[in-house]
Regions:
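Short, charge-rich binding segments
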Residues: 50-54, 64, 82-88, 139-142, ...
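Walker A/P-loop nucleotide-binding motif
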Residues: 54-79
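Post-Walker A helix-loop "phosphate-sensing" segment adjacent to the P-loop in P-loop NTPases
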Residues: 78-90, 122-123
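Glycine/charge-rich, flexible interdomain linkers and switch-proximal surface loops
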Residues: 60, 64-65, 94-96, 100
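Conserved short-loop catalytic and cofactor-binding motifs
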Residues: 31, 99, 208
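A short, basic N-terminal segment
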Residues: 1-57, 79-82
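Mid-core helix/loop region of P-loop NTP-binding domains shared across ATPases and GTPases
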Residues: 2-6, 12-16, 25, 56, ...
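Short coil/turn segments at secondary-structure boundaries
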Residues: 34, 63-68, 102-103
């Protein structure tokens, strides 16, 4: 048995396939994101006031699955955190939540509880009035001068399951905060998502919108080729495989 295990570990150490397998992971963020330069510039211009600790518009990113929405905003997350750490005189927290995850997708309470946990607080998964959870959320984030960005992926799925009120309540939080500034970044595959919102909710958003168009065939080929060159050792991926 030991010799078999040794062979497995030795084979892994002597991997002849990958230079860096992590490059193929869904959460990998490259140093450059090809064919999304314009969208990233737009995101940067909208969120740039954060660097001075100033309130910024809420932001909604739209596009079909696989168009680089989440990748682009996570890239911008790293850029903002890096700059604030170097130059800022306030704290910046950026938290990502996929609202389609089963453990949070069906109630406003569960989403708030998960956000509280991500921001370092504690709340039971069930058992409290939702209004109480909102109060705990406000108390948690308003303890000190800071800027918080909440990235809510698949936000349209949550609004459909819960109601417009969830989004309305989130966008109204800034009026109850004295020290902290809050920005919502929503990500949706549904380009008509905002059109279906209650006018009261839509007016409370004060949002900017960016649409991510689908990649064309040549762009996809370039992206895959670049990623494969970084991930695999030479000659592993034969010419013509990515076409």
């Amino acid at each position: 048995m030991k010799s078999d295990i040794d062979k497995i570990f030795e084979s892994f150490d002597d991997n002849r396939i990958f230079k860096d397998k992590s490059i193929l992971q869904s959460n990998y963020i490259p140093e450059e994101i090809p064919h999304r330069e314009e969208q990233i510039k737009q995101v940067a211009s909208i969120l740039a006031p954060i660097l001075r600790g100033e309130r910024t518009s809420n932001l909604f990113l739209y596009g079909k699955t696989g168009t680089g929405k989440t990748l682009s905003i996570m890239y911008m997350k790293d850029e903002l955190l890096k700059r604030v750490k170097k130059e800022g005189d306030f704290k910046l927290k950026i938290e990502y939540l996929n609202c389609k995850m089963k453990k949070v997708s069906d109630t406003e309470y569960r989403i708030l509880a998960e956000l509280i946990k991500k921001l370092g607080g504690e709340v039971p998964n069930t058992g409290l009035p939702t209004e109480t959870v909102y109060t705990k959320f406000i108390e948690l984030i308003d303890r000190e001068k800071q800027f918080i960005v909440l990235i809510l992926d698949e936000i349209d799925q949550t609004v459909k399951k819960i109601s417009n009120d969830f989004l309305y309540n989130l966008t109204r939080l800034n009026s109850e905060l004295s020290k902290t500034k809050l920005c919502i970044v929503g990500i949706s595959n549904d380009l008509t998502f905002l059109d279906g919102l209650d006018p009261r909710v839509r007016s409370s958003l004060s949002e900017e919108e960016i649409v991510f168009p689908p990649y064309n065939a040549l762009q996809l080929q370039e992206i895959l080729s670049k990623r494969s060159l970084e991930a695999f050792k030479e000659s592993v991926v034969q010419e013509g495989v990515i076409t």
